[in-house]
Amino acid sequence: MEKYEKLEKVGEGTYGKVYKAKEISTGQIVALKKTRLEMDEEGVPPTALREISLLQMLSQSLYIVRLLNVEHVDKPPKNATHTPPKPLIYLVFEYLDTDLKKFIDTFRKGVNPRPLPNSLVQSFLFQLCKGVAHCHSHGVLHRDLKPQNLLLDQQKGILKIADLGLGRAFTVPLKSYTHEIVTLWYRAPEVLLGSTTYSTGVDIWSVGCIFGECNRV
């Protein structure tokens, strides 16, 4: 990854680590999402392929995080001359400086705990609904909407949906999906009860939960 200089780790999840980085040639600040390819896997993991394809399809929306590039890297092993290099995939995203969870916590955990101002809640919910509507109009369920997956540009007041690793293209009539999805607190009742046939309502339920979270002290 000679093109980028890692500055700090900003997140870590089930599907990889996320770094704040600088593109050396331009000085642009970006986010790098690292996904390791296990040696017994044939090619790129399905979650990474799915996220790449969905982001490319949805990238024209202001309210979806932009995928800038995809980099494949063979990382040499440490202190093992006969070990094959470890293949890695880096997804290069536009960088946003915080997420909704951290932003809410700045209000909730201060010396004077309080919910977000109504004007901010209204703005964020409007942008979230626009992003979700864009996903659904292109036949995509996000399935993991939560404050940690909503990135914020604090200077511009813009909210963007991120982390489509659990996203799915949906069809009519509906087909079966796994019910082992999304963080428990934002999970729709039909998913909690084990249904494998569901549609856009699972994302709308999560939007309602996020709205409640914004107003909770």
Question: Regions from the language model: what does each represent?
Answer:
Residues 191-202, 216:
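Conserved end of the kinase activation segment
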Residues 49-50, 86-90, 94-156, 205:
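Conserved alphaE helix
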Residues 166-168:
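Activation segment
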Residues 177-191:
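Conserved activation segment of eukaryotic-like protein kinases, specifically the C-terminal portion
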Residues 29, 34-60, 75-77:
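Conserved N-lobe beta3->alphaC-helix segment of eukaryotic protein kinase catalytic domains
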Residues 60-71:
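Conserved HxN/HPN-centered segment at the entrance to the catalytic loop
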Residues 17:
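Conserved N-lobe ATP-binding subsite of Hanks-type protein kinase domains
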Residues 22-30:
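Conserved N-lobe loop of protein kinases adjacent to the ATP-binding glycine-rich P-loop
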